[in-house]
Design a protein with these regions (language model features):
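Two-component/phosphorelay signaling modules centered on CheY-like receiver
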Residues: 13-31, 97
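Acidic, metal-coordinating helix/loop segments flanking the phosphotransfer/catalytic sites
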Residues: 32-50
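Acidic catalytic/metal-coordinating carboxylates
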Residues: 35, 61-64
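Active-site residues of response regulator receiver
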Residues: 54
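The feature encodes the CheY-like receiver
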Residues: 58
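Short amphipathic alpha-helix used as the core "switch/output" element in two-component signaling
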Residues: 63-74
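C-terminal output helix
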Residues: 104-113
Length: 114
């Protein structure tokens, strides 16, 4: 059975390493990107099943890419993450999009990913 793939686009290195460690232990293949440009390349090349996308990145607002990402990957489960609650007002959760406030707890992760 193929491993599920997760892409984490976030410029906070500590957060990325904690998430990578968590998901690697769960049997996922994990890809990390610290910029939108790098993340979009990995998204297209590696075809992950799940995306964790931060909003405030060095090269732009991650959440502005949502429509483009959904258009090309309607099968992708997306978790939008931010430490800034006011950013959530512009996005509506759907079956495909989940919004989580940072810091993400292991309780949230365990409830979503077992």
């Amino acid at each position: 059975m193929l491993k599920k793939k997760i892409l984490i686009i976030d410029d906070e290195q500590d957060y990325c390493m904690i998430m990578k460690s968590y998901f690697t232990r769960k049997g996922y293949e994990v890809f990390l990107a610290s910029t939108l440009k790098e993340g979009m390349k990995i998204l297209n090349d590696s075809r992950p099943d799940i995306l964790f996308l931060d909003n405030n990145l060095p090269d732009g607002k991650g959440w502005l890419m949502i429509d483009q990402i959904i258009e090309s990957r309607s099968d992708l489960k997306i978790f939008l993450v931010s430490a800034f609650r006011q950013e959530f007002e512009s996005i509506k959760p759907t079956d495909q999009i989940t919004i989580w406030e940072k810091p993400i707890s292991f309780t949230h992760l365990n409830s979503a990913f077992g």
